[in-house]
Amino acid sequence: MADRGPQPWRARTTGALIGTACVALVATGGVVSSGNGKQAHHLMALGPHNIDPGADPVTTTLPPSTTTTTTTTTTTTLPPLEVLSISPAQGAEGVASGMPVTVVLSGPPRAGAPMPALVPAAKGQWTVSGSTLTFTPSFGYAPWSTEHIVVPEALAGPESSSFHVAGAPLLRVQQLLAELRYLPLDYGPTPGVSGLAKAAPIAALVSPRTLPGTFTWRFSTTPASLRALWTPGKESVVTTGALMHFEADENLPEGGPIDPQLWAALKEAVASRATDPVAYDYLMVSEALPEQLVVWRNGADLYKTPVNTGVPGAWTETGTYPVYARFWTTTMIGTDVDGYHYDVPNVPWVAYFNGGDAVHGYWRSSYGYPQSNGCVELPVDNAQVVWSMDPIGTLVNVSA
């Protein structure tokens, strides 16, 4: 092909790209390569009317717009919690039934973390204050039990501790005896009204925890000698007699310590709302002449009889004692103050209350002054009447 010499540069394009290409060229100037290998220099002020439709096309490739999104995930690993302390301490003895349990952690528990468990289970509620967890029992732990505190692994464990619960408090036993009418007293938040009369919740009644309230005498005529023997929460012959009476009714060993067997029987009786099937009797023996015995029952002097007490050297010991053994008839063997050995069979209506001293029937020509070897002797027929009112645990008061 003949050299045509310098030719105006011709480009071919279409549509909207025309304006775009032209603007680009104008803005750039300089050298542009055409499809025929020729170069055009110093293009100036090219507009759409300068484009030769027969020229080779110029292909312009624009790079795509690319957006890259980067997501960063940060994982924070919290250190595991540790148990700093547990109260009551491991192996603690004699822990009160209502004592709270406290678990102190190295930090606040995580949301949704399980609370420690008590085994055997006890009703109550856990509360959280910072890193301290506190369990407050609703009705107390079972007396004489061993409680285990188990901290689960999901909280801060696994870790465990245990403590030993004290026996039933004497005051609580007295409250239950009052509920069951084995005492001449009522117990409750309202003076003169027992928990049973108010239909108190059974869970509260059988709880080993002492309940708030007051003891009040059931009878305004309660003898002064009986009132003087009673102190709430303290050992006394009044409590001993009531327990012996209850044990006899329940066919339990009489006069033993307060133990799990006795406590279980008390709870069962309260839960079934059983009460003492007999009245409250109190026997008062006066050694003032003429000697007599008075049976005080449920607020009134119900029965009186002349009696004989011990002769000098074999005095009937003064004080108050519970009846601990009873016989329709028995043989009495001993030695009197003169050294005479006696062996008397078929002594009737016998109720022992202080060692070898007993209230019983005996055949005498007269009564009302000291004649016995320490016992309280009654006319036989009268002794039968009194025997019907002195069950096991009945208190016998002997005064000078």
Show where each model-derived region lies.
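Acidic, low-complexity Ser/Thr/Gly/Pro-rich repeat segments typical of extracellular/periplasmic
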Residues: 12-32, 37-65, 74-172, 185-191, ...
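N-terminal post-signal-peptidase region of extra-cytosolic proteins
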Residues: 83-92, 119-121, 130-137, 266-282, ...
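Extracytoplasmic/secreted envelope proteins and their assembly/folding machinery
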Residues: 98, 102, 146-148, 170-174, ...
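Sec-exported extracytoplasmic/periplasmic mature domains
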Residues: 106, 110, 152-156, 178-183, ...
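Short acidic, glycine/serine/threonine-rich helix-capping segments at coil-helix boundaries
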Residues: 160-168, 175-268
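Cell wall/extracellular polymer interaction/catalysis modules
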Residues: 248-256, 260-318
